């Protein structure tokens, strides 16, 4: 979402029209401060380059950020903090919280046009089907 498509690949800078970000790590500093730093050998440069939250000036498409309420507190915090930072940068962002979903169940909702993320993806593309009648 923060790639310079024109410079790096010769593609239109607005080639991506939107994105759905799920259960992500948007600032990698906490990883380096955790026990994981023993096996995840990030350098300062890698941390900077891979921390999306530090490149919001390059974000040029609306995004949807999501997480499930049964995910780890760190995934939830990262999503909330990232959404707040995107809003503060004046960029379009929406937060979707999957009540009762864990890290592995959230992606499963993409496969159904009425599922939490499937519907969000279709709505973002302006292709959402009508809600089923009860």
Tell me the role of every PLM-derived stretch.
Residues 12-14, 56-59:
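Short, conserved loop/helix-junction motifs that constitute active-site signature segments
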Residues 10, 54-55, 87:
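A general structural signal for stabilizing positions within well-ordered secondary structure
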Residues 1-37, 47-48:
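Primarily recognizes the serine-hydrolase "nucleophile elbow" in alpha/beta-hydrolase
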Residues 41-54:
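Alpha-helical scaffolding within the catalytic cores
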Residues 53, 68-71:
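Lipolytic serine-hydrolase domain surface
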Residues 66, 73-83, 87-134:
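C-terminal catalytic histidine-bearing segment of alpha/beta-hydrolase fold enzymes
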Residues 15-18, 61-62, 91:
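Loop/turn elements at helix/coil->beta-strand transitions in domains of secreted/extracellular proteins
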Residues 59-60, 65-68:
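Short beta-strand/loop motif that positions the catalytic acidic residue
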